[in-house]
């Protein structure tokens, strides 16, 4: 074993990264949870991570039938969501499964899903530091290693379109998002569009941390930019599916400890 370890000291960074990728592929996989269970866990994870703002915000994920998705019932906070009280709605927000009604603001989720077939999960919240940063009408600045999954992957909507319950807001927000993973919405909050529930949950945790770091750094002095090549390398490295799965598994364990009812039917 010592000999094998020593052999890696002459390896290039690229080779070591490939070895690590192979290790991730061999050791990290899907949790086996249903999509609804993952959405419910994401609600609890983000509640604990400071994304609570009363009944504001929605966390959705594509359901099994095309053109449908899971969402919360209007009137429930993130800390009350379980796998059993989620709704399944169509693009027009008609309830197909579950009791109650969806938040009318889910309409812009429908616009994003329709325009981005690659998106499997959307997290929209008014997290405290994100909301504070949004009041300054400035883009998110990614300048710290932990937040590089968002490097050059967070758009900015500088104009507040008002309460997002109409098709106009859906068009504006989905256009601002473009092909990015996230968008900071001035005077509003944030939206993350993930390739999986795990990725969306992880990025939502990170965008609130990135906003908090940016506000703290701005108070101390000018923020220095990351070297572009290294930042892109870090973005691609940290945004791999297995990394999102590993992150989510950790967040889920914490959520299950604090909220043992989350997976109840």
Language-model features, listed with the residues they occupy:
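Glycine-rich flexible loops
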Residues: 2-265
